[in-house]
Each structure stands twice: as C-alpha cells, then as structure tokens.
Amino acid sequence: MNITLLANHDIASNLALNLLLPKLKDHRITVYLSSRVGKVGAKPQALEALQSFEQALLHSLSEESDSHASTASRLQSFSALGKLIGRPIDTLNQINSPAGQSILAAGRPDLVVTIRYGVILQQPVIALPRHGVINLHSGPLPDYRGVMASFWGMLKGASELGTTLH
C-alpha cells in the first residue's frame, strides 16, 4: 500500500515516526513535514524558547544518528528515517495549494496519516487518497481542539489525557 505520512518537524513527530516507520516496512512510505504547528505570527517568549530548545535537540539528534554506525537504540533523525524508507523526507507546508496537491498526488497515496501536521487539510487534499485520511489528534475531541491539546489538558488539571484518531 502507498501510505503518505504527514507530520511536523518536531520531537513528538520524530518519536512517532521512529515508532511507526519500522512497522510499515512492507509498504511504500512517503513522509512530508510541516515546519510549524499553529498560526503564523508572534509567539510568546516562552514558546520561542521551547522551539529553540527543541530545534537544538533535533539538530543534535541528526548529528548523533548520522555519526553512529548503529543507531538501533537511539532515535533516528528525520534524515536517517528517510534512508530507512528509501526516500528523503521533505517539507511541505503548502499542501492545500495546487502545487502542494500535485506533489501529494504524484505519490498516488492509498492512505494519508497525519500526526501533528501543522496544516488543516482541505477537501481537495482529503479526496486524493483512495482509502482516505486518518488524523491522530493530540487530545480528546471536541474538548481539546487546536494545538498543544495535551498541555491544555494538564493546565486545566484533567485527571486523564487522551488522543483522538479520526
């Protein structure tokens, strides 16, 4: 099956791909990353600091996994994961644009799975894969819509955290 995974260029998505991609080795996998989650604009200073820290961790992970011959016990960088699936992992922020739709359609996906992808897919994109789109949302819907759902749950003192697969 041709499966396209849409994720974000962050630690949580990297971990998810490290866990998921080895299980999909019998399928043809394509991965596209968004470069952010949420709206474009000024962020609070604390979020800027968190993003800088996370990007430094990703850079360190990339250097570490590229310099070790055996990384079986370590998280693989996005670059190393691209080697695992036999194709580079590219950034695709404008997936709803005609050019983005063409890029997605060229892979002829049977299924699209989104995990923390930073763009809400519009109907023309949703209609492309033969078996549809599955989205993993980081919180229970409809209570925790939007980005950082797990953190909103913790902030509100939720006794349980969850996800929504829809």
Q: Residue ranges of each PLM-predicted region?
A:
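One-carbon transfer enzymes
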Residues: 1-166
